[in-house]
């Protein structure tokens, strides 16, 4: 084979070797970053390291006293989490249902004395970072898709039948003991037809067998809610 034919083959071999080395190095850097982050989160003297992947079910009620154009609701929620061993960061899938406790209305008029039901699916990620031995910061970002069910007055579009929005939660978490944590934070982003809840306060208690109990209280302008959640590790 002549030198003119050998040259393209040699260049191709060098290019393949270079790409392989670059891929290996990029993969190594990525693995090193994740390994270092996980090592830092798991070895720090941060309480509640026993959190593990779990299924969480919750029930709550919302009281809306903004006026006769708004309704109270009962809420049911289920969440499946996939977290790191330290429980500090991970991903989740969320399913929810909210039903009005009396005839639904809107700011523009009644919805023909019909209860309103909201079914939702969503998913997101959360992160918890240590700041001090007993203090940490948390953040959560999720995207939700809702389907509304109600009787619509003929020719009038008061509420959407479907809606999608993103929501963020962030705040500070105080670790009172190895099993108890208190949190205070803000809620941003949600559908206009939902109660305008802005602040969130919670108490989390770790039970035996990688289970947990959470009580949440949320507030907004003339709106308040409470929620109890039970998580079971697997």
Whereabouts are the PLM-identified features?
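Short glycine/proline- and aromatic-enriched beta-strand/turn motifs that initiate or cap beta-hairpins
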Residues: 20-90, 96-101
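Transmembrane beta-strand segments that form the barrel wall of outer-membrane beta-barrel proteins
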Residues: 27, 53-63, 91-95, 137-144, ...
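Flexible, solvent-exposed loop segments that connect beta-strands
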Residues: 61-69, 99-118, 147-164
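Transmembrane beta-barrel architecture of outer-membrane proteins
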Residues: 71-77, 118-122, 165-169, 196-198, ...
